[in-house]
Amino acid sequence: MAENAESAERFWGQFHGQNTGYLEQQFELYKEDPELVESSIRTIFDTHGAPSWLSSTENVKSVSNASDFDVTKLTSAIRLVEAIRRYGHTDADIYPVGGYKGDRSKMLDLSTYNLKEQDLEKIPASWIWEKQAPGVATALDVVNQLKKYYTGTITFEYDHVNNDEERKWLFDLIEEGNARLDPSDDERKKILQRLADVEGFEKFLHKTFVGQKRFSIEGLESMVPMIDHIVQYSNQDSIEHVMMGMAHRGRLSVLANVLGKPYDKIFSEFNYTKEKELMPSEGSRAINYGWTGDVKYHYGAEKEVEFGNKGQTRITLAHNPSHLEFVNPVVEGFTRAAQDDRSEKGYPKQVTNKAVSVLIHGDAAFIGEGVVAETLNLSGLPGYSTGGTLHIIANNLLGYTTDREDGRSTRYASDLAKGFEIPVIRVNADDPISCISAIKIAYEYRQKFQKDFLIDLVGYRRYGHNEMDEPRTTQPSLYQQIDDHPSVASLFGKGMEEKGILQEGGFEEVKSAVEKKLTDIYKGMTESEIGEPEAKLMPQVLTNGLDQFTTAIDLATLKSINEELLERPEGFKGFKKTERILQRRKDALEEGNKADWGTGEALAFASILKEGTPIRLTGQDTERGTFAHRHIVLHDVETGEKYSPLHGLSDVEASFDVRNSPLSEAGVLGFEYGYSVQSPDTLVIWEAQFGDFANAGQVIFDQFISSARAKWGEKSNMVLLLPHGYEGQGPEHSSARLERFLQMAAENNWIVANVTSSAQLFHILRRQAAMRDRDEARPLVLMTPKSSLIRHPRMGATAEEFTDGGFLALRDQPGFEANREKVTRLVVGSGKMMIDIEEAMDDSDETYDWLQIKRVEQIYPFPKKALEEEIKQLPNLKEIVWVQEEPKNMGAWNFVDDYLRELLNEDQKLKVISRPDRSAPAGGIPTVHKTAQNKIIKQALNQSEGGKSSAGN
């Protein structure tokens, strides 16, 4: 912005002779397009306006004592100042050890601009720096002052932030000298005490539990006071939740010193009782003494804190596996769930000040793990944003034994964040004041702009990757420096003694007090406390079955809901073809008609909302549905306005949150899992575009959804909709890898189902909603139909199937009634294969009086009792045949084999009919697919043909 006329006139009065001609030429270019002139010249015109001799007919006399002045020196000085802002980080004092500063940018050298200090001394500070701090008179003073701001123990990168307001806010904060805090003596003593607590705790563990893994925080101790300040600021702003995610590095110190986990509890976890039997007995399907538990540095914790009268803030540290960074989207899901008000119909009302996310990353993992980028991409999306996350990279210079030049292609570990326009502060972990200053900036930026902020906390790792590892074999030079380097507490404490804040020897007194406290706690522990804590027992309700939930609805209510779903706001003009399809649902519940899959799903959602349960439904293309069956969000063809029929329901006091997700599996799946954990009152549903793509989120399935309750007692009720079925579309559009979910099925950890009617879908979703926030709750993994089945008449259901009974884990083959006295073969299968068999039977003249068919709609928990009751009614049964369209080494066969074998008599056989073992799930040639499918059907329905016998029978 141009200055006032007097100031501008005074500035332009400095130039004479050939300089004025040069400036006139440059100004003509500037008027045509500012981008045509060099940035330093552009800055002059932006600041001072047009040269005064061009804007006034009067002869302006110089107010300076100087006569002629070389304008190139001025422009060079401006360029140098801008370079300090942009490249100062390359010369910053941010590395406590390691000599990792790297190449200092030549743009910081005076020689690059043909400048000398004498040249800068001739230029008034006001010409090149609008802030002009006290005592800064010349351009040389400006350069030195800005180097203090940009090349000290705290440095900044924000030039990549495109928003002018955000960039100016950071610029003003830094260059007005307000970036670095100046704590009082008492505040410094509190920081020292925290550092001493952390160091003392780590040293006590090191000498007391020699050689045991703990993933020490030493070298990054300043992280703890940084987190302290986040919590304090959050509480002062009445933020209710601070949601934290971090890996194992430093986790025990954070648990002890931030979350307040008792020291004796942590000490007890370092002692192991060999007699404790925690493994299942041979042949048993249950744990004898309890669940699996986890190592001490994976556990999370919660704590409520209060500073003053602003109410309580709950700190939550998420449980975390060793799979680095995958907790990030989980924590974001926690935070969004805490922010959303789901008590009214429509979309939830988000209040970002109710919760804040704090993610602590590793330097190698932040740029190495793709889930980080997936999570950062969520930060600005309406369905996933949490109003800004505070990121801290716990940068210890190494990834296990891997040096940074082998671990990343960028200069800094934080460079990934620049692509998302996230401001970056790098700070030396040996300077606690710079560290807490960085936190204050990050927090205030988040609160003001509702965006992410990243701090690269640069320190080191005192020991190896873990305390049993010897780092000197791979980084001898670095560890020679680390061995000789004092701790941050020592440096800070000695500095306070030198300044007279502490008396001489005061720091040693602080250290001794910490050591005595920890020693007394450990000595005071009883023998039982020193032993390993008792493992928790699996809740008994998980083994009690799932039959107690009522899911049927009376016909009048169902019809009323269906009618409401077909209503539209006045003036809304939907796409005619879509509306015609949806209006067909109007008579779906009348006698003689059937409700298709899309109708059954919509009725389930609507009825769940009517009963007060919020729903969150996300996934790629979920609003319409991959196979165009859902159309749960409609678009006005004239205005583009969106409308969901589920938002128009009457008498609803629960939100319906439906979102098309970004093209991500791991990130989005982790987010939805976290949302489901934090909001147990909500039915959270994630849908894969095709089930085949779900395995891009395999870590979330393995480490969280399937096992979190057994490891950590963390409960989720989320639903996974995975389109699955062989239609000749090749190996990437056929299989949701059912076998993998079944391989992980144990301890009633989740439900795995493959239902074959819209009513079954209706009941299983309503059952899942009924389990919300109860001990019976667990995830549902549901294989869903695709193009060939989703509108198939055989997948439809009559009104009675919705209004009577409930979900059937074992289901009769529709339209077929067996002659049980004559049955010699029992065919059992699941999913699309059973529809294909049903069609083949209808097309045949065969009576099939030798055959009985049962559909296993819920594969886990397996309906063993129901199937056993059926077998008892088949006195002449000779064989049980499992039929599936997947290859023999995939699908459900390897899982159901044991269950089915247990049901056999000595004279009965167990067989399987399937595609042969394959490395890929399906073939890519439609004709070959059809031939193989027909062969399976023929074998299942031909009394003289059979499948392969199960091993052991």
Curated annotation (Swiss-Prot):
It is an enzyme of class 1 (oxidoreductase). GO terms for cellular component: cytosol; oxoglutarate dehydrogenase complex. The keyword Oxidoreductase applies. Keywords: Glycolysis, Oxidoreductase, Thiamine pyrophosphate. Its EC number is 1.2.4.2. Belongs to the alpha-ketoglutarate dehydrogenase family. This is 2-oxoglutarate dehydrogenase E1 component. The gene is odhA.
